[in-house]
């Protein structure tokens, strides 16, 4: 046991928590690309034997989950792409415009723990089918709300959160039960491509459909039909894998503990808590930029070119289109870059994942600030700085998800996903769009209305994002201090070497500083 422990401490942190070691396995740090490919094939065969799902079918399931993720983000940011039209149609202020996104996030946030609890205990495929069907129906209904009933439009947009809560707490755990190690990282990165691509397509589709149909309501009628296709794919193609089958090293089945025990254990997991707060800052920044970015660029264009984007109820969507394109490209580029850098850095540093996240957050802050500072003089420079800043922000999407999956035991992952969603949205993008709108309104109060005042007020409000980004980097740096210990504890549980709850009954007495001391079994095994 001693030799094995020392080897585990010295070995490079190449793979994630569920990459279990075999006796006589070569040092992961010395793997060539051919060896990694062979290892991937072996993992695929092993996964098929343990889950009863072939590698090809597993990839197909991930593609379906990617499609669902894409649709949900596309629907969410279609609203952001036509926000100027919504504001004109309902005659609302900046703060009320921010509420359109905030009510959705609040609904999503409060429903996430419910679906997290259900996802750890019941059929995950059925839960997603029900949630997505409801989301498609409510999204369609929201497109028929007339301009006299803004409160009803807010209500329907809030209910849309059911769909995202039903899949976002569950989909990553299904991927975790289908793949191991680097394969899991790659599949998670592919799944999270849908976040930026869906955001960008939402801006583009919203603006294109609105300009073609001459009515922004039609933009909300695109995704419901596609949601029905997603439900059919889940029913007839997707298959649910057994929970934690790939990670068990004994015949002892994984058993659920009570929800309160799950939450108590998660609150004692510093890597989970700190990475969740780090991701909260990501949600704050991206939520504010996603809703207000196109609107701010439109206002900047008014100041620079002395033009009026919205004339006769029709708005100029060049900025929404460009912002959407940038979001797509930078998201894919950032996720790919983050995963690849972390994979290579992990060979020499086991804390690679949180460190890459920290560098991305801290580095993005000055570029976000510069994008705002140059907006009234050069839109080209603004777009360039937005491109760099959003790329750096996107480094962490797949890495944060991977951190959660390898520091949390399989029977608590949906609950952990739900808690992370609640915290990140409660303190992040649930309030940031509304907060930015309120600050903008307060800055404008008492001043003569002008294009310059409208732009400046939103500019100063959005500068908060740069400071929040630096704070997020600090949380990820703190995560790096605990990541190894929490990862090993989750590994030991998955291998049947550690119970889910470390009470006094699972502690042993060891000599420490000349006296007998009770310590957790995990501290000895590690």
Curated annotation (Swiss-Prot):
<feature type="transmembrane region" description="Helical">
    <location>
        <begin position="419"/>
        <end position="439"/>
    </location>
</feature>
<dbReference type="InterPro" id="IPR011701">
    <property type="entry name" value="MFS"/>
</dbReference>
<feature type="transmembrane region" description="Helical">
    <location>
        <begin position="321"/>
        <end position="341"/>
    </location>
</feature>
<feature type="transmembrane region" description="Helical">
    <location>
        <begin position="48"/>
        <end position="68"/>
    </location>
</feature>
<feature type="transmembrane region" description="Helical">
    <location>
        <begin position="187"/>
        <end position="207"/>
    </location>
</feature>
<feature type="transmembrane region" description="Helical">
    <location>
        <begin position="98"/>
        <end position="118"/>
    </location>
</feature>
<feature type="transmembrane region" description="Helical">
    <location>
        <begin position="385"/>
        <end position="405"/>
    </location>
</feature>
<keyword id="KW-1133">Transmembrane helix</keyword>
<keyword id="KW-0445">Lipid transport</keyword>
<comment type="function">
    <text>Mediates the rate-limiting, proton-dependent, lysosomal efflux of lysophospholipids. Selective for zwitterionic headgroups such as lysophosphatidylcholine (LPC) and lysophosphatidylethanolamine (LPE). Essential player in lysosomal homeostasis.</text>
</comment>
<protein>
    <recommendedName>
        <fullName>Protein spinster homolog 1</fullName>
    </recommendedName>
</protein>
<dbReference type="GO" id="GO:0022857">
    <property type="term" value="F:transmembrane transporter activity"/>
</dbReference>
<dbReference type="GO" id="GO:0005765">
    <property type="term" value="C:lysosomal membrane"/>
</dbReference>
<keyword id="KW-0812">Transmembrane</keyword>
<dbReference type="InterPro" id="IPR044770">
    <property type="entry name" value="MFS_spinster-like"/>
</dbReference>
<keyword id="KW-0458">Lysosome</keyword>
<feature type="transmembrane region" description="Helical">
    <location>
        <begin position="126"/>
        <end position="146"/>
    </location>
</feature>
<dbReference type="InterPro" id="IPR036259">
    <property type="entry name" value="MFS_trans_sf"/>
</dbReference>
<keyword id="KW-0813">Transport</keyword>
<feature type="transmembrane region" description="Helical">
    <location>
        <begin position="272"/>
        <end position="292"/>
    </location>
</feature>
<feature type="transmembrane region" description="Helical">
    <location>
        <begin position="218"/>
        <end position="238"/>
    </location>
</feature>
<dbReference type="GO" id="GO:0006869">
    <property type="term" value="P:lipid transport"/>
</dbReference>
<dbReference type="Pfam" id="PF07690">
    <property type="entry name" value="MFS_1"/>
</dbReference>
<feature type="transmembrane region" description="Helical">
    <location>
        <begin position="159"/>
        <end position="179"/>
    </location>
</feature>
<comment type="similarity">
    <text>Belongs to the major facilitator superfamily. Spinster (TC 2.A.1.49) family.</text>
</comment>
<dbReference type="InterPro" id="IPR020846">
    <property type="entry name" value="MFS_dom"/>
</dbReference>
<keyword id="KW-0472">Membrane</keyword>
<feature type="region of interest" description="Disordered">
    <location>
        <begin position="1"/>
        <end position="43"/>
    </location>
</feature>
<feature type="transmembrane region" description="Helical">
    <location>
        <begin position="463"/>
        <end position="483"/>
    </location>
</feature>
<feature type="transmembrane region" description="Helical">
    <location>
        <begin position="355"/>
        <end position="375"/>
    </location>
</feature>
């Amino acid at each position: 046991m001693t030799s094995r422990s020392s080897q585990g401490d010295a070995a490079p942190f190449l793979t994630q928590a569920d990459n279990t070691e075999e006796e006589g396995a070569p040092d992961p740090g010395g793997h060539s690309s051919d060896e990694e490919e062979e290892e991937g094939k072996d993992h695929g065969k092993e996964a098929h034997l343990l889950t009863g799902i072939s590698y090809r079918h597993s990839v197909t399931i991930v593609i379906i989950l990617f499609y669902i993720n894409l649709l949900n983000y596309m629907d969410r940011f279609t609203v952001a792409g036509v926000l100027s039209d919504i504001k004109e149609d309902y005659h609302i202020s900046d703060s009320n415009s921010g509420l359109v996104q905030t009510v959705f996030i609040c609904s999503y946030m409060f429903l996430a723990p419910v679906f997290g609890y259900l996802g750890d205990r019941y059929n995950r495929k059925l839960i997603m089918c029900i949630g997505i069907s409801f989301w498609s129906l409510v999204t369609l209904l929201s497109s028929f709300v007339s301009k006299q009933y803004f409160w009803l439009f807010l209500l329907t947009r809030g209910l849309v959160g059911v769909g995202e809560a039903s899949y976002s707490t569950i989909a990553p755990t299904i991927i975790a039960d289908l793949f191991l190690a680097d394969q899991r990282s790659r599949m998670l990165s592919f799944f999270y491509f849908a976040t930026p691509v869906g955001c960008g397509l939402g801006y583009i589709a919203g603006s294109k459909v609105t300009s073609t149909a001459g009515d922004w309501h039609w933009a909300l009628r695109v995704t419901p039909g596609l949601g029905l296709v997603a439900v059919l794919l889940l029913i007839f193609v997707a298959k649910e894998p057994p929970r934690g089958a790939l990670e068990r090293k004994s015949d002892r089945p994984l058993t659920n503990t009570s929800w309160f025990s799950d939450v108590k254990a998660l609150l004692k997991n510093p890597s989970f808590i700190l990475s969740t707060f780090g991701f909260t800052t990501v949600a704050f920044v991206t939520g504010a930029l996603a809703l207000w970015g196109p609107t701010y660029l439109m206002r900047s264009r008014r100041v620079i070119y002395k033009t009026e984007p919205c004339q006769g109820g029709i708005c100029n969507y060049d900025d929404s289109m460009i912002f959407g394109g940038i979001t797509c490209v930078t998201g894919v580029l950032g996720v790919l870059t983050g995963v690849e850098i972390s994979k290579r850095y992990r060979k020499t540093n086991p804390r690679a994942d949180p460190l890459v996240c920290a560098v991305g957050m801290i580095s993005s802050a000055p570029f976000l600030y510069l994008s705002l500072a140059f907006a009234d003089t050069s839109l080209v420079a603004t777009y360039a700085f937005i491109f760099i800043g959003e790329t750096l922000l996107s480094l962490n999407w797949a890495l944060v998800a991977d951190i959660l999956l390898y520091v949390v035991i399989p029977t608590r992952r949906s609950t952990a996903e739900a808690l992370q969603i609640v915290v990140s949205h409660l303190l992040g993008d649930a309030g940031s769009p509304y907060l930015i709108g309120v600050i903008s309104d307060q800055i404008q109060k008492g001043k003569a209305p002008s294009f310059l005042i409208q732009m400046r007020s939103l500019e100063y409000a959005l500068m908060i994002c740069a400071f929040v980004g630096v704070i997020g980097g600090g949380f990820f740096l703190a995560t790096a201090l605990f990541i190894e210990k929490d990862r090993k504890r989750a590994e030991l549980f998955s291998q049947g070497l550690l119970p889910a709850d470390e009470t006094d009954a699972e502690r042993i007495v060891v000599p420490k500083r000349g006296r007998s001391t009770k310590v957790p079994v995990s501290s000895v095994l590690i």
